[in-house]
A protein has these predicted regions:
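Catalytic cores of nucleic-acid endonucleases
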Residues: 97-158
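P-loop NTPase nucleotide-binding core
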Residues: 33, 72-73, 162
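Short, solvent-exposed loop/turn segments that connect beta-strands within catalytic domains
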Residues: 75, 87-91, 127
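Short secondary-structure capping micro-motifs at structural edges
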Residues: 36-40, 68-72, 78-84, 118-123
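Non-catalytic C-terminal interaction segments of nucleic acid-processing enzymes
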Residues: 1, 14, 151-197
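Conserved catalytic cores of phosphodiester-cleaving nucleases, focusing on short active-site segments
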Residues: 55, 80-101
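A short acidic/basic microdomain associated with nuclease active sites
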Residues: 53-76
Length: 197
């Protein structure tokens, strides 16, 4: 998992970086410089592919179709971030991936509604399986790492709406992948240094 992340960070750092542009406060303050926001968004997509690759490589699990799907019995289409099956347990895992759970007031209910809507669709699509759904926040190793009341409040808001938040360590346990908290945060710091180079 970590090796793939380092490889991808090196690849991204060698590509032409998007620069801050006139109209942004960063540009006004410091002029054109490498857009860290763009790098974070790009690496967020890499995280999604890293998790999917890990699931493909883990015996007993099967990656299911993700991406934009038409919801059963509706004209709506929604994007499914991560969907996989524990073959032995007949457990479907659906996760909306968020690298930043500090969502603004409007996005939190919309994200919660999306997860619940998709979970109903998936229950109809996979009636012979148990569904485990929620949000996966890969920027945090474990919920105990969150000390800010603001973050804890966001988690309570999601959970009170019926949507659980899981973290990197949760998916690592599910996939029997051994990565310590120290290794995980060291990995992210390495990625950050590479992307800023």
């Amino acid at each position: 998992f970590c090796k793939k992340g380092i490889e991808e960070a090196n690849r991204i750092s060698k590509e032409k970086a998007k620069m801050t542009e006139i109209g942004s406060m960063k540009y006004s303050l410091w002029g054109p410089e490498k857009s860290e926001q763009s790098l974070v968004i790009r690496f967020g997509r890499v995280c999604e592919s890293m998790i999917k690759e890990q699931i493909r490589d883990t015996e007993g699990f099967s990656l299911l179709p993700s991406g934009v799907q038409r919801l059963s019995g509706m004209k709506k289409k929604k994007d499914v971030d991560l969907l996989f099956l524990d073959i032995e347990k007949k457990m479907i895992y659906y996760r909306e991936l968020k690298t930043n759970i500090e969502l603004d007031t409007e996005k939190l209910p919309a994200t919660s509604d999306k997860v619940k809507l998709l979970s109903k669709h998936l229950e109809k699509t996979y009636p012979d399986c148990t569904l485990d759904f929620g949000i996966l926040c890969l920027s945090v190793f474990d919920q105990k790492n969150l000390t800010q009341n603001k973050m804890k409040s966001k988690i309570r808001q999601f959970e009170s709406s019926g949507v659980k938040i899981t973290f990197a360590n949760d998916i690592f346990k599910t996939l029997s992948l051994t990565i310590t908290e120290q290794e995980y945060y060291k990995f992210w710091r390495q990625i950050g240094k590479i992307l800023r180079s």
